[in-house]
Amino acid sequence: MNKLESPSEIDVAGPSPRHKTTQVMVGNVAVGGGAPIVVQSMTNTDTADIEGTIAQVAALSRAGSEMVRMTVDRDEAAAAVPHIRDGLRKRGITTPLIGDFHYIGHKLLADHPSCAEALDKYRINPGNVGFKDKRDKQFTDIVETAIKYGKAVRIGANWGSLDQELLTHLMEENANSAAPLDARAVTREAMVQSALLSAKRAEEIGLPKTRMVLSAKVSAVQDLIAVYQTLASRSDYAIHLGLTEAGMGSKGIVASSAALGILLQQGIGDTIRISLTPEPGGDRTLEVQVAQELLQTMGFRTFVPLVAACPGCGRTTSTTFQELARSIQDFIRDEMPNWKTQYPGVEQLNVAVMGCIVNGPGESKHADIGISLPGTGEAPAAPVFVDGKKFKTLRGPAIAQDFKALVIDYIEQRYGDAAKARAEAVSAAE
């Protein structure tokens, strides 16, 4: 008889403890300091297009983005920001807004105080905040504006716009070293130093750690991992993760998930953005969905009910289970904005849609509610399991519609008014 082995490295499953960072409030959202990892997104509208930007921020917020960044690149964009904020509030949307500033941020914030006041956080790129003798003055101007209005700041170094003076200095220093590093290693060090030196300067000006978030974005996965590991080892600032220029479609999703997944597993990261290049006319909210799915798949947070579905094989020549899995998944995601308030806790629901008898019944039993559809050559019957027990068997051409109705009924019974009434009755009896 086989015996359970003594506890070993397999008895614990989970990420490393979270890297300890200083908590920062961005509007009404806590970042770092043990707070849940925050999902961030960015608009791609012309910020001067007030109605268009309001619509996209609203869509991103509805999809689950907890902070939204937008470009503030000229006077017209800066002037639009307070109107965007006001328009969102009229819709009941209080998602924190982040202004993305490059080159002339100091001037835009000074010339448009209503913009400075309306934003919840300013993003500064130390590589282009100013050049030569203007850098310190322009950086100081932005930081002092943040102090004046009580705003948070993200100091975001970027591989594509790195501080060239710092990089040149480190390259020359490396060339004269007895054991020089390769150029990419020096560039990674420049990324880390750019962020940390800028943060130190911001503190000297008067901005506390409680208002600072750091990032150091790279487009290559291994470089990004190394940069953030080093950044985390040298500081306790809140950290924003993102793979810059990740790309389109599956390439962008895979690259971002690979890089961020490793860092998150190591306990690094307080807020994330999945920077996907959208298809022409594509849905901007996809980046929010991918970020949520990454965090939920890794067990950090729950956003929407999970739908488990088998990949299909020669036993499942019918597309019925695929169509049902897609229908259930789309239905759940579309309804979640309403369900959040109507059915508290529904995001923890697990649904299984399986395609044949091999794994179907077992996986369905592990889910809260699951169905095992008939595979090729199997009897045209689909057993449904609820809370691990067989509930009923569906037959006929309307199996998909019938199962969807059962899912809706299960949600109502477990998370709706009936569930609340049962809980209140139990509480009263005690």
From Swiss-Prot:
Organism: Nitrobacter winogradskyi (strain ATCC 25391 / DSM 10237 / CIP 104748 / NCIMB 11846 / Nb-255)
The protein's required cofactors: [4Fe-4S] cluster
Entry binding sites for [4Fe-4S] cluster: C310, C313, C356, E363
Protein name, entry field: 4-hydroxy-3-methylbut-2-en-1-yl diphosphate synthase (flavodoxin)
Disulfide bonding pattern of the chain: none
BP terms from Gene Ontology: isopentenyl diphosphate biosynthetic process, methylerythritol 4-phosphate pathway; terpenoid biosynthetic process
Cross-referenced InterPro entries: Dihydropteroate_synth-like_sf, IspG_bac, IspG_bac-typ, NO2/SO3_Rdtase_4Fe4S_sf
Domain of life where this protein originates: Bacteria
Similarity remark: Belongs to the IspG family.
